């Protein structure tokens, strides 16, 4: 089922999510709905709080991006164990419709999480999948991609976003 995407400045986007203790039918339905919502919005990643659910769950599917390796993941209670290198990439966000900003992130990350079956997974992500993972992990921590900007860059991005919001009304 496609759910509504929470739009910034909704408060849920500013609060850290809660760890998932039990992967029950409700969580499995959430995961299915997250994929449905992400595909409908033509995104490549989605955090649960972006559809109003304050749980530490993300879904990623990089296959729509032609120049990225196809990767489909469900990650529950994810964390970065290690990061290396730096990469700048112009990111968009489903919770900031129409806005894209250049953000610096790790080029490569080692990740621990649970999969949709509750099994521990360790992954090494590099390039675009690493960027998507870090973007979604930030959401789960209550951080948006605009929060990664400093000074005038942040101010300009927020001003541009306000104009985009007004033009949508």
Curated annotation (Swiss-Prot):
Cofactor(s) the protein requires to work: Fe(2+)
GO terms for biological process, alphabetical: co-translational protein modification; translation
Cofactor note: Binds 1 Fe(2+) ion.
Sequence positions that bind Fe cation: 93, 135, 139
Domain of life according to the entry: Bacteria
GO molecular-function terms, A-Z: metal ion binding; peptide deformylase activity
Pfam families referenced in this protein's UniProt entry, alphabetically: Pep_deformylase (PF01327)
Keyword field: Hydrolase, Iron, Metal-binding, Protein biosynthesis
Record: active site: 136
Enzyme class: hydrolase
Gene3D superfamilies per record: Peptide deformylase
E.C. no: 3.5.1.88
Catalytic activity: N-terminal N-formyl-L-methionyl-[peptide] + H2O = N-terminal L-methionyl-[peptide] + formate
Reported function: Removes the formyl group from the N-terminal Met of newly synthesized proteins. Requires at least a dipeptide for an efficient rate of reaction. N-terminal L-methionine is a prerequisite for activity but the enzyme has broad specificity at other positions.
NCBIfam families from the UniProt entry: pept_deformyl (TIGR00079), PRK00150.1-3 (NF001159)
Family classification: Belongs to the polypeptide deformylase family.
Name this polypeptide is given: Peptide deformylase
Organism whose genome encodes this protein: Aquifex aeolicus (strain VF5)
Lineage: Bacteria, Pseudomonadati, Aquificota, Aquificia, Aquificales
The gene coding this protein: def
